[in-house]
Amino acid sequence: VGDVRDSRVVWEDSDSGKFFVSYLFDHPDASNKHYYMNKMRHPGNTHKFHAGGDPFKFKKTRTNKKSDGAGAVFMLRDGTVDHPQLDISQWKTNRFCCTYSNRPKDKDIYGEDMLMMCVYYGCEMYPEINVDLIWEYFEKRGYFAYLTFGTDRKTGKIQKTPGGFSRGEAIEEIFRMWHSYIEWHCEREMHREILQQCKEIDDDMGDYDLFVAGGHALVGANKLAFNPIADKVKEWEKESYYDLHEI
């Protein structure tokens, strides 16, 4: 609130805003959900939302365009809203509810935008880590527990770094998640900007930052059941990189 760090995040309508939002909480107390464990702040709505992020790169893309920093929040299916007998075409959840595509002058502005997005929805972030901007910024700000860690496919162990890449097998997983989502749910999707990138995407994803961010949100949501953050929290606290601030 009022540009005060670590306070409540409140949305305001603006013609020059950086976010497209299709879902806001009806009651303010439902937003900014969090709790503390081992003196570390954790998001409190991880069963309802998950975010993905694709930081901007300094090099130009194939079309000679500077990439944007992108972010997306996916609203998971809520069984209390969309009961099992309800036809999928009538669901109100299981769709994207927030997107962001912008290239601020300062990379920390992008990092703070992604953090505030996650704080408002009370969700974790599965970031693109070819560029470790989001990961480092969340850690620096004391929001390490707002990051999602995947599992190593070969060992089955939790990965040492949060998020995922956009190359090799990781690209295939992003495309698989998008293919499934579009096949079953695209008719209900409210964010045309993200569907447009899905329509235009090719093998080179450099010009499609929102596609990557949304893909990471889908992948991250799928990994939540395999995300024992407690071990990572203990490791992080042991090294004592930063002070934590409670509100």
Regions found by a protein language model. Name each.
Residues L147-H185:
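Short alpha-helix plus adjacent loop in nuclease-associated cores
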Residues V1-F149, Y181-I247:
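RNase H-like, metal-dependent nuclease domains and their acidic two-metal-ion catalytic environment used
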